Amino acid sequence: MEHLKYPIGLFEAPSFNLQLCSIWIEELRQLPGQMRGLVEHLSPEQLDTPYRPEGWTVRQLVHHVADSHHHSYARFKWALTENRPIIKDYNEKNWAELEEAKSTDIEPSLLHLEAVHLRLVRLLESMAEEDFKRVFIHPSEPDPISLFENTGRYAWHGKHHLAHIQRLISREGWAV
């Protein structure tokens, strides 16, 4: 079950590396198109299929990624404009269980993901090396999170959920 839950493994933050940051920014740039390419032709029944037993549906995953990356974008801006801000956490599981996340068409979330990533990538590309060392405080994390780490975490997060959907499509033999 663990391989279904974490198909690309857990995120492990490496030491600061500006070249790695550039790779992550490119992955973030590509994520909305990759997500759209995977899900835009799925039927409503396929969108409502859980990616694993007791897991979210594809529809919930799409809405979750849009919600989560919106939060991440705000965290970058807080950390760039405030000194060690304490960010507001949210219960992603509860958000995904809202009827809206279970039944709304995915197109608004795909458009939102595209818009957020346009802004996020532009913000990341405008940052100086020292900016990536700025931090925010996450209430459920023991250590401050640097913007370098957050960049990697969200590049990983996108690939993590793309892998959930890709593997489901492959297991089910769905045409893409």
Segments and roles (model prediction):
Residues 20, 27, 53, 57, ...:
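Alpha-helix N-cap/loop-to-helix boundary motif
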Residues 1-30:
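Terminal targeting/low-complexity segments that flank the catalytic cores of oxidoreductases
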Residues 1-12, 48-93, 121, 135-176:
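Short, contiguous alpha-helical
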Residues 26-38, 96-134:
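Acidic/histidine-rich alpha-helical segments that form the ligand environment
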Residues 22, 26-29, 59, 63, ...:
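A generic "alpha-helical surface" signal
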Residues 19-54:
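Short, contiguous, helix-prone interaction/anchoring segments in small proteins
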Residues 16-20, 95-109, 140-149:
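Acidic/His metal-coordination segments adjacent to aromatic residues that form catalytic metal sites
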Residues 38, 42-45, 83, 127-130, ...:
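A short secondary-structure junction motif
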